[in-house]
């Protein structure tokens, strides 16, 4: 099945049908904020999002794109400025440390990946800087805004540059 917003096309399955209206409303409210943030007056092709209803298929796609096996916590990724791969809510809950995620977490995950796509579109001729891209995505998506935990920044400069730290460190750096 397929549904679209102004800037996205979402491919989903029957597994996702129960929350698609909520997801679509959320994405429509937030996509324009992100597009305006990056000043993308000429957006180009819509970003194509696939909600995978099978974790193994999602991991195969990741391996196909990045030529490596994903970590067991990976639940979404963006590539080529126009593709986003995420998991359906039930499959998202099967990844490490995501057992209790809800529809709001899925919405923020998709917006996080959409931010990457917009950042790449806005800076297509620039070198990819992980700490900047992840800092923007974790902060603008609000992924950590409603979490009660008191996070402490605990990453080295090398970990931030190489992307070998927890995502909350990128968030904390930008807050």
Task: Kindly give the residue locations of the regions a language model identified.
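Extracytoplasmic/secreted envelope proteins and their assembly/folding machinery
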Residues: 24, 28-31, 134, 138, ...
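Juxtacatalytic substrate-recognition/specificity segment
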Residues: 2-117
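Glycine-centered structural positions embedded in regular secondary structure
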Residues: 73-77, 135, 170
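Sec-exported extracytoplasmic/periplasmic mature domains
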Residues: 35-39, 115-124, 141-146, 175
